[in-house]
Amino acid sequence: MPHPAPTAPQIRFGIVGSGWRSAFFLRIARAVPERFAVTGLVTRSADTGRALEEEWGIRTFRTAAELLAAEAPSFVVVSVPRSAAPDVIADLVDRGVAVLTETPPGATVADLERLDALVRQGARIEVAEQYPLSPLLAAQLAIAAGGRLGRISQATVAQCHDYHGVRVMRRALGIGFEDATITASRFSSPIVAGPDRDGDPVREEIVTAEQTTARFDFGDRLGVYDFSDRQYFSWIRRNRLLVRGERGEIVDEHVSWLLDATTPTWADITRVETGQGGNLEGHHLRGLLLGSEWIHENPFAPGRLADDEIAIAQCLVEMHAHAAGGPSTNPLAEASQDHHLALLMHEAAATGKPVRSTRRAWAD
């Protein structure tokens, strides 16, 4: 069984932004209060601030200066639109604050290069790219990197959009900043609408799903991206992951590999959750097994967190360590490369022509 997580100090962080994604950080702090606390949240709207204070029991401020004057957090989460993020990040850096920003950190390559210059000057800017830390993906990527599949040559990712999908693809392939030739296309198809951010559908309705499929040819490795804009909330469009190596492959939760040239073996990735049937431990994820081997342990058990929240909570833990002088684990350069390749993918889809990436400043 997974070992209990060691006692850790409470991580106190601030938030700039009051949108939908900000609520993920607030839910984490509410679910695991011994590990996380929000020192305050910045929103320009006094009405929004009052509503958040009532719902979440937090303090809100109109400016970052007011937030920082009230209490010095370990770091500040920036959760604002990508067009506004670079200015907000730069302002916090000027105030000597470490920043964990949502994805993407900027809208354009120029934005990314501007932020890269701040990092080179000593700014502590990390990016909350949570998908590789989500329990199932973390387990799958650990298997891919662990050697039993041999050298990885191909990955097909139908998991998440744009830069998120690119990050999972790059991680599965072991790709750093190598250049790629990108081809892409779009396809529209009808689908029955599922739930959305506002809840379940109230009637059956046919809507249009916009699907982007792309190939990233890195020479000796191939990444395939496939995602529909209706996929996140759809009950009838499941996520998929294929990772192929010379000695085996991962197909979603199924793993096959060779122990030697004449001995194949297979195992499934299985979730271990409490609170099912007659189990009275509460409802949380303990971890994931590959056969009988633990390959992922939930460090926030028994907190009642969704997989995405477990991943974001891990981003907070790693950011706290970096803000205190530890290594960078979610660097701006990696997120910049993800977004850069995603922008090129959309260019290839729009023009119908192959696009070749070139090395950017953050890669050096």
Regions found by a protein language model. Name each.
Residues 70, 75, 81-82, 86-132:
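Beta-strand-loop-alpha-helix segment that lines the small-molecule cofactor/substrate pocket
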Residues 135-154, 165:
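Rossmann-like NAD(P)H-binding beta-loop-alpha module
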Residues 151-238, 242, 363:
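Rossmann-like dinucleotide-binding domain that binds NAD(P)(H)
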